[in-house]
Amino acid sequence: MTKPYPRAFSHIGLSVRDIDRSYKFYTEVLGFYTIMPPTEVEQDDSAIGIMCDRVFGPGWGRFKIAHLSTADKVGIELFEFPDNYPPENNLEYRKLGIFHFCIQDPDIEGLAEKIVAAGGKQRMPVSEYYPGEKPYRMVYCEDPDGNILELYSHSYELTYSPGAYQHQLDE
């Protein structure tokens, strides 16, 4: 058996209510690059139509999609399906599957303000992981559709590096 190796994270797909509003939010507020602006895909015999039949099953009809990219080349796909709807609880953390994704920015306070000004929501106060010891901060927010995004002030590796919780173990 071949030893496993770390794979790169390629992209995430987000279902949104209004693709034009979400496209503007993710490009203008979060600064993501446009790979493909909002485009309509219809069920037909094209390669993409057949591929979508395999993913969504028969009768999906049509949807709109946009492809974006982050600074570290992770793709963000925005999907607007007809008759889509928000979940009753957008933070179903006990439900299996993805319940949030995280964006890194050194000024999470400023970015959270921009998110709120653009129709999103700040779910909690900015919090410090190691008050008085390390400057690592985080906050949970929502995009205008209620998709949960976390903001980190520092990289995941720095925040959770070996010894990150050592001060708690020594007490």
Model-derived features: positions:
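A short acidic/small-residue loop/turn micro-motif
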Residues: E42, D83, S155-L158
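Short, flexible turn/loop "capping" segments at secondary-structure junctions
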Residues: T2-P6, L91-K95
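Core segments of cupin and vicinal oxygen chelate
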Residues: S15-K73, A117, H167
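Short beta-strand-to-loop junctions in surface cap/lid or active-site-entrance loops
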Residues: F79-Y85
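A cross-kingdom feature marking solvent-exposed beta-strand/loop segments within repeated
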Residues: A47-M51, P86-P87, Y130-P131
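Short, structured motif recognition centered on aromatic/hydrophobic residues
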Residues: F9, K73-L78, I98, L149
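Short, solvent-exposed beta-strand edge segments and adjacent coil->beta transition regions
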Residues: R7-H11, F63, L96-H100, Y136
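Vicinal oxygen chelate
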Residues: M1-Y5, L14, P37, I76, ...
